[in-house]
Amino acid sequence: MPSISVRRLFDDNQYKLQLAWAAGNSGADNRIGVEADKPVLALVGHLNFIHPNQIQVVGLAESEYLNRLESGETGYQFGDLFDISMSLVIVANGLPVSPGLRDYCHKNDIPLLTSKLESPYLMDVLRIYLQRTLAASSVKHGVFLDVFEIGVLITGHSGLGKSELALELISRGHSLIADDAVELFRIGPETLEGRCSPMLRDFLEVRGLGILNIRHIFGETSIRPKKILQLIINLVEADDEYMKQLDRLSIRTETESILNVNVRSVTLPVAVGRNLAVLVEAAVRNYILQLRGKDSTREFLERHQTQLKENEQHNEDRPD
């Protein structure tokens, strides 16, 4: 199961969440990971001794209870209640850290962080962060682009011209997200987010030209850090026989399953004389229309059927 260290969580969110170390530095390598019986959103929560979260957040009410615990009002000791499995404790709302909590975290190698932010906002940000960071992932071969604000993954065998097609689309004002190895993360039940590894970011390999830095050539707007995957365009090599066998009036919706998420897909035959950049743009525009409930093929078939009925009626009404 995917997991991250407390150290990475701190480094990624230190400035955004105003985090600071208070104790337990030796536990910086503690792991925070998805459990089989718990969703990612359940990893973070207010201090809970019955159903402990991996990340325990101390807010106003929890801080007041800990102060009572430390003063002996409750009849319990820290060790009695804190004998639970947890990876990290965060004291929010800019509250002071009680000496008892600091000592317990130090002795048990549990990282203790503080934040000046309110606990509900802190937990919301951490849940979104963990949902993205710990998402199930896969790597697909292809080129991932932002075309008309739609995340489009172009796939196909090597040598079909995916990179050249991507370069043409970028020159027409669209944006590159990832080339060659597209990292896909399931950030929601029906949502895949495509990203590029830091090593390959900004680069596009084109046969004959080598490695191109798209950001330097086309400017900042030619690159996007991530995008929701909505459409897959699969390039296939086609000859005359293949083109003859195509169903030109198909109304079936093709999908491809990635990480148990169905993504709309379109197959584009690659043949001499076909302008693939224009075809990709047309496919994306058609997809946008279908999202709005407009299907050109179905509309044509309905119009054709209406015309046939009108002709049939006209023939019946015509005198012999």
Swiss-Prot record:
The active site is at H141, K162, D180 (proton acceptor), R248. Both phosphorylation and phosphorolysis are carried out by the same active site and suggest a common mechanism for both reactions. One of its GO terms (molecular function) is ATP binding. Mg(2+) binds at S163, E205. Its cofactor is Mg(2+). ATP binds at G156, H157, S158, G159, L160, G161, K162, S163. Residues 204-213 are annotated as: Important for the catalytic mechanism of both phosphorylation and dephosphorylation. Homohexamer. Keywords: ATP-binding, Kinase, Magnesium, Metal-binding, Multifunctional enzyme, Nucleotide-binding, Serine/threonine-protein kinase, Transferase. It comes from the Bacteria. One of its GO terms (biological process) is regulation of carbohydrate metabolic process. Belongs to the HPrK/P family. This is HPr kinase/phosphorylase. Catalyzes the ATP- as well as the pyrophosphate-dependent phosphorylation of a specific serine residue in HPr, a phosphocarrier protein of the phosphoenolpyruvate-dependent sugar phosphotransferase system (PTS). HprK/P also catalyzes the pyrophosphate-producing, inorganic phosphate-dependent dephosphorylation (phosphorolysis) of seryl-phosphorylated HPr (P-Ser-HPr).
